[in-house]
Amino acid sequence: MDSYRIGVIRVLTTEDPELLNLHGRLLERYFPMFRVESRCIPDQYEAIHDDATMAAGVPKVVAMARQMYEEGFDAIIVSCAGDPGVREARSAVPIPVVGGGESTASLAQFYGGKAGTVGITADIPEAYTRILEGHIIPEAGIGK
């Protein structure tokens, strides 16, 4: 079986190896042909959750995508529902770059019907509203 070197970009800076590698371990469990290496972007201890953190984080995602491409990775996954830097990274490297938001919304669309979202902010990520237009369950008001 062929194997693929997959880079996972975490948009939350952490020194905790369990947290850093959590998504990569799941990917390797469900896709045994993946050899995953997870890295976090620097100086984003509050992750990417608003315009200011997006402006600071996107260039870091793109720089890490370039570095991973230069190191021979076969594909990159940006592990965040907001897909920060995904479009920009796709323009910067000639390998597949997949965002957590786009991939999840596309899978929900494939299965059809309505979809709900749960997130770290009250906002629904752009990829969800773009891909699932008209098929998102209205806000339930939890936590208000």
Can you annotate each of these PLM segments?
Residues 1-56, 119-144:
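N-terminal glycine-rich anion-binding loop in soluble enzyme alpha/beta folds
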Residues 37-39, 77-78, 97-100:
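General beta-strand structural signal in soluble alpha/beta enzymes
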Residues 55-72:
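Short, well-structured alpha-helical segments in soluble
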Residues 83-87, 104-105, 125:
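Short, well-ordered alpha-helical microsegments
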Residues 90-111:
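Short, acidic/small-residue loops that bind anionic groups at enzyme active sites
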